[in-house]
């Protein structure tokens, strides 16, 4: 079961028992949500149909909702223009073209998305393996070095990469906390992530810069890292391997922007981003085999509390997806 099924009815527990609830199937579980999934076609569509027994009789529901699965935002955009989709995210190029042309028929349909419950982070792999499953000693030694990691923190400017998500207001994507902005507020009205900024000793978000960047500290830690790691047998540049879906041009374009950002920020003498691809399953082909140097991943809490985010980073149980899959 999942959070959409809570709170659980006591009458259901009385009827099928605790063990029966743990083993419940769609045929015997009690459910009173707005929609039921009436059709699911793998890698194609899922259809949600209005539940006539939904408890909120005043709610205005669609008769059905069809969610289409597509391989890229470019494909989705084409489906939108032909009327097959009702809304779509735009690639950087499509957004820029439409936004800068007020006569474009889609210009007045542009809406800036509200922030979701997700927060994205870089997750370093400290036990990277090569394709033959031997240990990637060069990367593992480098990423274990604190000065090397601080170079990423103080040096990596992601402004150009943020434009891939929001070309108009790219720094709205910037966040130094595990939680999304606007998730929770303190009793005095302080927004939680602004408190995190304060505790980190960083200035408040200004919407125009990445507040953690510090060129002087970056150069200091780069020199320190290269000295310490050279002594430890690491060869430079250190290659960081990053995976995207094969055949996805949008993902490749974004990865190339990230590669250039790494080059501009670190210098090709220090760190080089290598772009690789997987065929169908990022987890099975990459994460389970520990082939990635890092992953860019997001967590969205099932309830609005920072603990639910932080548990993914610090909990060593099987329920901590990040720790288990990306750790």
What do these predicted regions represent?
Residues 97-114, 305-323:
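Ligand-binding "clamshell"
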Residues 33-37, 46-47, 63-68, 236-247, ...:
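Short, well-ordered beta-strand elements
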Residues 49-50, 142-264:
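Append "and occasionally in soluble cytosolic enzymes with long acidic Gly/Pro-rich linkers
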Residues 30, 41-43, 60-62, 112-134, ...:
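Short, solvent-exposed loop/turn segments at the edges of secondary structure
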């Amino acid at each position: 079961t999942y959070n959409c099924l809570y709170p659980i009815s006591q009458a259901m527990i009385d009827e099928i028992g605790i063990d029966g609830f743990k083993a419940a199937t769609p045929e015997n579980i009690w459910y009173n949500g707005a929609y039921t999934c009436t059709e699911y076609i793998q890698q194609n569509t899922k259809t949600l149909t209005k539940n006539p027994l939904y408890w909120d009789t005043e709610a205005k529901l669609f008769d059905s909702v069809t969610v289409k699965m597509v391989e890229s935002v470019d494909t989705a955009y084409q489906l939108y223009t032909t009327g097959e989709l009702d809304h779509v995210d735009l690639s950087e190029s499509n957004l820029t073209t439409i936004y800068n042309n007020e006569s474009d028929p889609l210009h007045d349909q542009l809406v800036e998305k509200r922030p979701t419950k997700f927060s994205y982070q870089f997750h370093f792999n400290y036990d990277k393996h090569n394709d033959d499953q031997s240990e990637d000693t060069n990367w593992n030694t480098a990423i274990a070095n604190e000065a090397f990691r601080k170079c990423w923190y103080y040096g990596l400017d992601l402004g150009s990469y943020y434009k891939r998500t929001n070309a108009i207001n790219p720094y709205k994507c910037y966040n130094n906390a595990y939680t999304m902005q606007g998730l929770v507020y303190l009793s005095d009205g302080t927004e939680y992530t602004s408190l995190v900024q304060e505790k980190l000793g960083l200035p408040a978000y200004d919407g125009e810069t990445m507040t953690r960047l510090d060129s002087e500290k970056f150069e200091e830690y780069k020199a320190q890292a290269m000295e310490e790691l050279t002594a430890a047998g690491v060869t430079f540049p250190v290659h960081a391997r990053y995976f995207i879906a094969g055949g996805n041009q949008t993902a490749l374009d974004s990865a190339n922007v990230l590669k250039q950002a790494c080059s501009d920020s670190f210098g090709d003498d220090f760190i080089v981003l290598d772009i690789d691809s997987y065929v169908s399953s990022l987890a099975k082909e990459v994460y389970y085999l520990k082939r990635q140097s890092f992953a860019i991943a997001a967590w969205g809490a099932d309830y609005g509390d920072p603990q639910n985010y932080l548990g993914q980073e610090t909990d060593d149980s099987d329920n901590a997806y990040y720790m288990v899959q990306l750790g």
